Amino acid sequence: MILGLVGRPNCGKSTFFKSATLSDVLIADYPFATIKPNHGMAYVKIHDLAADFGKISNPRAGYVREGNRFVPVDLFDVAGLVEGASEGKGLGNQFLDDLAGVDAFIHVVDMSGETNAEGKQTTDYDVSRDITIIENELDLWYLGVLKRAWTTLMKGMEMQKTQFAKTVAKQFSGLKVTEEDVNHVVLYEKLDITRPSVWSDKTLFHFARALRIYTKPMIIAANKVDRPNGATNFKKIKAQFSYPMIACFADGELSLRQADKAGIIKYIPGENDFVIIGKLNEAQANALETIRKVMVEFSGTGVQEVLNHVVFDLLKYVAVFPAGSKMEDSKGNVLPDCFLMPPKSTALDFAYKLHTDIGDKFVKAINLKTKQAVGKDYVIKHLDGLEIMTR
């Protein structure tokens, strides 16, 4: 799974990225600080299943803190997007190429109104423009892919009576669009696909937009709510758009994670407070108190909440553990692995995720919590622990 950070220049994308990954990236107060995409590991926060059995997990990837398990996901921070990117303006072509493989967008929006659409300093900027500009550029990107040899492809499809979904999915294969995705959008939007070669430009755009929204869902990370106009703009903008929107203070999250790493405070990502455990100078104490006030107002910094919302609410993935009766691998590690599986995944899908041979030889699975056997068609649930039995 890959999550992509999008947004116009100087909106705080790189700060969000660094706060989520603690990767060493350039953070600067000017447009296009990010040229090449940054790639790092962020983490979704789940309950540590081992805690239900009086144990603590030993993750092979990720980490555990106080009953919370952090499971890794890929996070990309790409070059800032400006109006006209779909036509190559700014770093548009590079930006869009970098986004092809992501599964969902996290749109970082500067709620302060202190920088404009190009990332330059200003005052009282209309924040809603950022959302509509990014929306439109992503829609035009999909439309551009759709229109490549569209008439020729559709006439060929009509003559050969091939499936519309198969033809479109092939056109979008680089963007991870499936035939099932296309069929869903066609049915949901009630589109007539008997003669798509004569679709109007309006219908083409409508289809491209609907396909983009369905195949790459998006959340708004309403960043910089700590700034003077941030909270006011957040409340106003949230009422204008249907996208899920979470108030964020990426700068504060980064400071907390760095202070936690340095042993100055104890902070668990996603919590709404922290504990001071080290000695502070006056400047540090004041800075942390300022961060705490923002966290009280917004119930945290929002960064971890955004990551969890994308994976578990937008993409509807579930976390599942390979779990034998002793919950340990051959080296004594407790529940070392945890996998994020797509919605509606079955016990058999999970077996194949572990290894092809395990899937081929699947007999049944034993649910760690209930101790009951389940068959290959059992739809796995969030925080399931399953032991796969083979022949």
Place the predicted regions along the sequence by residue:
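Short, contiguous acidic and Ser/Thr-rich linear segments
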Residues: 331-346
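Loop/turn positions that initiate beta-strands
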Residues: 383-384
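Short amphipathic, charge-patterned alpha-helical segments
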Residues: 344-358
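Conserved G1/Walker A P-loop phosphate-binding module
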Residues: 1-159, 166-174, 213, 217
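Short acidic beta-strand-loop surface patches of small beta-rich interaction domains
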Residues: 363-379
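Short, surface-exposed secondary-structure boundary micro-motifs
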Residues: 110, 389-391
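Canonical P-loop GTPase G-domain recognition
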Residues: 145-148, 152-155, 160-162, 176, ...
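Non-catalytic, charge-rich alpha-helical accessory subdomains
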Residues: 158-236, 324
